[in-house]
A protein has these predicted regions:
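A small-residue-rich subset of transmembrane alpha-helices
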Residues: 54, 182-198, 208-221
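Transmembrane helix boundary and interhelical junction motifs in multipass membrane proteins
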Residues: 23-32, 157-167
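Transmembrane helix-bundle signature of multi-pass membrane transporters/permeases
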Residues: 18, 48-56, 180-191, 244
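Juxtamembrane transmembrane-helix boundary motif
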Residues: 1-17, 33, 37-39, 44, ...
Length: 262
């Protein structure tokens, strides 16, 4: 019976996380962590490690799919990724020096707000609009956005995927598919770094939820990325917005449930 419950929870967690990653470049940690903590009683630190490990392959397969469809900016993505990684460490260090800030639901609110934004004000930037930007301005914006995302992620420990998507579409002027493709490309490496450090510090988790979450998230991320790359910009904005709003509400519900039962 316990195996059945674990499989069902991991399937639902992988479904939500995979769709969020493939459609919107959302971090799997936002969905998987609260579900594992609430329904399987897994320690939050271990649950985050499992979620980050699930993120690695799901983000990698999504990035490959977006890249194959020419919806990935590797050059500027690498610049942003390096700055994100450096300033995540800086943010973590600064966070350790100041009184603890509890912003556990930050990424959930980011998810909800972004979802509403995509429905109400879709990102209709085109590839032609993107090519009008100068290489220098894109490079400078990549560094600035990387610093912001990295520092905030390190400081409060959440919100990377959604913040990246917001900055890539609103500040850097990417069209939605390229923004998601670049976001999942960066997340592949940030999630890998995060999961390795988690398990190096806290030890390996229970193998069943670990393997199931990775497999289910990977499958649904692959499906979502394939659909997203074939969809029209208007449809993709709407679908992405609806998925983010639903996931935001569901995760917020799990968070409230775990607080009530705690």
């Amino acid at each position: 019976m316990q195996y059945l419950i674990t499989t069902a929870v991991c399937l639902l967690a992988g479904l939500g996380a995979g769709l969020g990653t493939g459609f919107a470049g959302m971090s799997a940690a936002a969905v998987i962590t609260p579900m594992l903590v609430t329904f399987l009683g897994i320690e939050p630190y271990t649950a985050v490690g499992i979620a980050l490990a699930s993120d690695v392959l799901a983000s990698a397969v999504s990035a490959y799919t977006y890249g194959k469809n020419k919806n990935l900016d590797i050059k500027n993505g690498l610049v942003m990724m390096i700055t994100v990684l450096i300033f995540t460490v800086v943010g973590s260090f600064v966070s350790s020096l100041v009184p603890s800030v509890t912003m556990g639901n930050f990424s959930v609110f980011m998810t909800l707000l972004l979802g509403i934004k995509f429905i109400v004000r879709p990102v209709m930037t085109t590839k032609a609009d993107m090519s009008a930007r100068t290489a220098k301005s894109v490079l400078i914006k990549s560094i600035i956005c990387g610093i912001m995302v990295g520092f905030i992620c390190g400081f409060i420990g959440a919100g990377g995927g959604m913040m990246m998507l917001l900055l890539l579409t609103s500040v850097m002027g990417y069209e939605l598919k390229t923004a998601v493709g670049t976001s999942v490309f960066i997340m592949t490496f940030t999630a890998l770094t995060g999961s390795v450090s988690h398990f190096a510090i806290g030890g390996l988790p229970d193998m069943l939820p670990f393997i199931l979450c990775i497999i289910f998230t990977l499958i649904f991320a692959r499906i979502a990325a394939k659909i997203a790359n074939k969809a029209s910009p208007k449809t993709l904005n709407r679908v992405t917005g609806i998925i983010l709003v639903i996931l935001g509400i569901v995760v917020l519900g799990f968070s409230l449930l775990s607080n009530i039962t705690a």
